[in-house]
């Protein structure tokens, strides 16, 4: 009976993963021709409206400016669209109404790869790999030295848990960081963002 339930769970997980993969493959290819110019990194939402493909409206007539060099915090209830705002700024999705600019440039007109170079993103559902703490953080900037990785890790307070582990920074954390707590996984995500050292951090 237990084996059957495990097989059922595996089938459900496989169907979920296939569904997510199909969503990615079916998504339209994003394009953008404008190269980045040195106009700062202010993020401006001007009367932005956004709804998911299901028709659910998430944002309606949203306007604000996140100034370069300042911390901008969005406060609201769970499900209020705070995460959606950061994803739209990074163009994970395209908005239907209004305008979003970074440094005066419309995000939909910027080459996606160039746009992403502006952002370090701390995901709530961080993806970790069956590797060491150091190597998981190094994904923030491939080619970074151990010293650079450790500096970013300590800035994110990863040493509070890493130094207590059997192999410290070289401890293997298991698939998706199963050996760590949720808070510890989040700190690795923050360390990655610090290591990338992009002009804008989205939390």
Q: Which stretches of residues belong to each language-model region?
A:
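ABC-type nucleotide-binding domain
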Residues: 38-203
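General structural signal for alpha-helix termini and helix-helix connectors
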Residues: 3, 7, 30-31, 47, ...
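Cytosolic ends of transmembrane helices, especially the final helix of ABC transmembrane type-1 domains
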Residues: 1-24
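Pre-NBD coupling/linker segments of ABC/ABC-like ATPases
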Residues: 25-38
